[in-house]
Amino acid sequence: MLYYLIDYIERLYHPPGFQVIRFITVRAALASITALGIALGAGRGIIRWLRQQQLGEQVREGEAAGAISHAHKAGTPTMGGIIILLSVGGATLLWGAVANTYVWLSLVAMGGLGVVGFADDYVKTVRKQKDGLNAWYKVAGQVAVGLFVGSVLYFHPDFAAYNTFTFIPFLKDQVLDYDLFRFLELGVDLGWLVYLPVVVFIVTAVSNAVNLTDGLDGLTTGVTAFVSLGLVALVYVSGNAEFATFLNVMHLPGTGELTVFVAAVTAACFGFLWYNGYPATVFMGDTGALALGGAVGSTILMVRKELLLPLLGIVYFAEALSVIVQTSYFKYTRRRTGTGKRVFRMAPLHHHYEARGLHEAKIVTRFWIVTAITVIAALLILRIR
């Protein structure tokens, strides 16, 4: 809200220097500083409160006694995603143009999935049910958020000009149109029949993939910080007419305001990493993982760059794929031979490397490096076409 207040004062009294508040880059920097400050400042108190409430991580017996022992992590405060949500929400509300459709939709997507994650963490930590929220309820919450995001992106007037189009990597002057019914010329708008399921799938898949990645100290936090840095560049370029023309990508008026939101996400991740880095003094839990997945998924959809996701978020993709491959192959071999076999020693992928003897800090660092490289590659694709 400070943005509107300072802008009002500038228009009314014209004090020197106040006009800089209209620059997105300035507000993105201020949002970053604010989010980082909230995460670092409030983090210690929130962690202390979580510990007092005995909202600690529950380690399954198999994890405590198996080849990979996480017994030492039992009791570490979880639900730390509250820190991330407060940091991003506070910074964006202060410095963002919250009336902008892109901004409030991002906040709703992140907050909505954060609520779903909080419910899951609550069942685990307060009710002491290790499996957490019923899987169907969890998926229903993710689908509901996805449907809301998809409906706004398709039916809201601000998106009418390009509601079913998306960027195609490597191909110049080409876009993908999700409206597969357009060529039929029926005179009836049926594009939503394809677009809404696509949005629901992406929001659900990304949030689950981020959640699967959250298994080692600092892994999801660091990976998402790098992914968010890439998104900062994507949203700023998409909202800037000159840069969009130079890079020959779709110019999406208004998306520049998302820079403030994504910058806050990036800074909040770095602030949370202060406490979540190895050895972690707090875990984000599903509260943070699903919220970050909602932020990444909704943002990439809004700037029409979702086809870059497998590269931009390659660690998320690899973690989710490892679980799918492991589960599918185990069921297939058990049905064929009576004995289930595994492709990986453990899944998700980070546990496979743990089982091979790599220290979790080394695994985390290498996954960060891989993410940094693929984020740079994804940004280069904007130019190399």
From Swiss-Prot:
Its main location: membrane. GO terms for biological process: cell division; cell wall organization; peptidoglycan biosynthetic process; regulation of cell shape. Keywords: Cell cycle, Cell division, Cell inner membrane, Cell membrane, Cell shape, Cell wall biogenesis/degradation, Magnesium, Membrane, Metal-binding, Peptidoglycan synthesis, Transferase, Transmembrane, Transmembrane helix. It comes from the Bacteria. Its EC number is 2.7.8.13. It catalyses: UDP-N-acetyl-alpha-D-muramoyl-L-alanyl-gamma-D-glutamyl-meso-2,6-diaminopimeloyl-D-alanyl-D-alanine + di-trans,octa-cis-undecaprenyl phosphate = di-trans,octa-cis-undecaprenyl diphospho-N-acetyl-alpha-D-muramoyl-L-alanyl-D-glutamyl-meso-2,6-diaminopimeloyl-D-alanyl-D-alanine + UMP. Pathway: Cell wall biogenesis; peptidoglycan biosynthesis. Its cofactor is Mg(2+). The keyword Protein biosynthesis does not apply. InterPro entries: Glycosyl_transferase_4 (IPR000715), PNAcMuramoyl-5peptid_Trfase (IPR003524), PNAcMuramoyl-5peptid_Trfase_CS (IPR018480). It is a multi-pass membrane protein. Pfam families: Glycos_transf_4, MraY_sig1. It is found in: Cell inner membrane. The chain crosses the membrane at residues 23-43, 79-99, 103-123, 135-155, 186-206, 218-238, 258-278, 282-302, 307-327, 362-382. GO terms for molecular function: metal ion binding; phospho-N-acetylmuramoyl-pentapeptide-transferase activity; UDP-N-acetylmuramoyl-L-alanyl-D-glutamyl-meso-2,6-diaminopimelyl-D-alanyl-D-alanine:undecaprenyl-phosphate transferase activity. GO terms for cellular component: plasma membrane. Belongs to the glycosyltransferase 4 family. MraY subfamily. Catalyzes the initial step of the lipid cycle reactions in the biosynthesis of the cell wall peptidoglycan: transfers peptidoglycan precursor phospho-MurNAc-pentapeptide from UDP-MurNAc-pentapeptide onto the lipid carrier undecaprenyl phosphate, yielding undecaprenyl-pyrophosphoryl-MurNAc-pentapeptide, known as lipid I. PANTHER family: PHOSPHO-N-ACETYLMURAMOYL-PENTAPEPTIDE-TRANSFERASE, PHOSPHO-N-ACETYLMURAMOYL-PENTAPEPTIDE-TRANSFERASE HOMOLOG. This is Phospho-N-acetylmuramoyl-pentapeptide-transferase. The gene is mraY.
